[in-house]
Curated annotation (Swiss-Prot):
Its main location: cytoplasm. It catalyses: L-glutamate + NH4(+) + ATP = L-glutamine + ADP + phosphate + H(+). Found mainly in the vascular tissues of seedling roots. It comes from Zea mays (Maize). Keywords: ATP-binding, Cytoplasm, Ligase, Nucleotide-binding. Pfam families: Gln-synt_C, Gln-synt_N. The gene is GLN2. Plays a role in the flow of nitrogen into nitrogenous organic compounds. It is found in: Cytoplasm. This is Glutamine synthetase root isozyme 2.
């Protein structure tokens, strides 16, 4: 008799030319990832050739019960590390039946910014450092922690050993699964707080950064589901003298990566400072809890940048300063930020927005 594991790993390629496409979308909370699968007649490698689909938005907080149909539009395709073969993961965004984006569809606005000719010409690169915390399912307490608290921070960052590193098997599985899927995941590391980890998606261009980070989050959610562990993107899961969790966003444009780029970087950082409040408002919920000026953060109410200051709002690396070109790191985004929102706002502020007397208070103005 076949075991459940045998059927999960069943290879369909020798029996049918059909494939399974898992359609993924961002749910109504802005942080939940939802998905459902459908059968296609054969392999597809172009999202424009995939059929649109729909779902019950009243069950995800995205539509009322008396008009609940929400349309899924495929935007990006990834290899499916769970079903393997020709099966695919499909990142989608969501629309009303009349074609208007629903309020929780942040990709639509990001795609408009990234399709602007001035932005496209600069080829914006992003590298997002996604931090997260692994929690025990029954207690919602960090993985590996005793019922009370472990020893203070210090031994856990990038550590090895059963008394210092918790959940590495989950993290490594997610790492390999993302590579298999075709995500530009560039690394992983254990974080300062035990049970907390980080992966990096980099470099990714334009709206693709958001697509890739959301699918990486989905893969991580699926793997923790299998492991019976909860993944938390709360920016400060444990109060007190423990590091929070962020999504530091590294950024460069073609001009920044070229000779003389350091001056372009400094001008861009100046613009970010003028719109500090607007960026903070868009950089994730609960960000006031980690951004205290402690634990490698800047105070939420203050904008400061420096080389190579990890207590700054924006950090410039030594290599960038030395070479006179490169990238910078925005250290303000929380771990629960929406990558579509953060990446397009950074691009808009640094490339499309210009300060004026009427908006010099830092609130800024909408880009064209």
């Amino acid at each position: 008799m076949a075991l459940l594991s045998d059927l999960i790993n069943l290879d369909l390629s020798g029996r049918t030319g059909k494939i399974i496409a898992e359609y993924i979308w961002v749910g109504g909370s802005g942080m939940d990832v939802r998905s459902k699968a459908r059968t296609l007649s054969g392999p597809v490698d172009d999202p424009s050739k995939l059929p649109k689909w729909n779902f019950d938005g009243s069950s995800t907080g995205q539509a009322p019960g008396d008009d609940s149909e929400v349309i899924l539009c495929p935007r990006a395709i990834f290899r499916d590390p769970f079903r393997k073969g020709q099966n695919i993961l499909v990142m989608c965004d969501c629309y009303e039946p009349n074609g208007e984006p629903i309020p929780s569809n942040k990709r639509h606005g990001a795609a408009k910014i990234f399709s602007h000719p001035d932005v496209k010409a600069e080829e914006p690169w992003f590298g997002i450092e996604q931090e997260y915390t692994l929690l025990q399912k029954d207690t919602k307490w960090p993985l590996g922690w005793p019922l009370a608290y472990p020893g203070p921070q210090g031994p856990y960052y990038c550590a090895a050993g059963a008394d210092k590193s918790y959940g590495r098997d989950i993290v490594d599985c997610a790492y390999k699964a993302c590579l298999y899927a075709g995500i530009d995941i560039s690394g992983i590391n254990g974080e300062v707080m035990p049970g907390q980890w980080e992966f990096q998606v980099a470099p990714a261009v334009g709206v693709s950064a958001g697509d890739q980070l959301w699918v990486a989050r989905y893969i991580l959610e699926r793997i923790t589901e299998i492991a019976g562990v909860v993944v938390s993107f709360d920016p400060k899961p444990i109060p007190g003298d423990w590091n929070g969790a962020g999504a530091h966003t590294n950024y460069s444009t073609k001009s920044m990566r070229s000779d003389g780029g350091y001056e372009v970087i400094k001008k861009a950082i100046g613009k970010l400072g003028l719109r500090h409040r607007e960026h903070i408002a868009a950089y994730g919920d609960g960000n006031e809890r980690p951004l205290t000026g402690r634990h490698e953060t800047a105070d939420i109410n203050t904008f400061v940048w420096g080389v190579p200051n990890r207590g700054a709002s924006v950090r410039v690396g030594r290599d960038t300063e030395k070479e006179g070109k490169g990238y910078f790191e925005d250290r303000r985004p929380a771990s629960n930020m929406d990558p579509y929102v953060v990446t397009c706002l950074i691009a808009e502020t640094t490339m499309l927005w210009e300060p004026s007397h009427s908006n010099g208070d830092g609130k800024g103005a909408a880009a064209p």
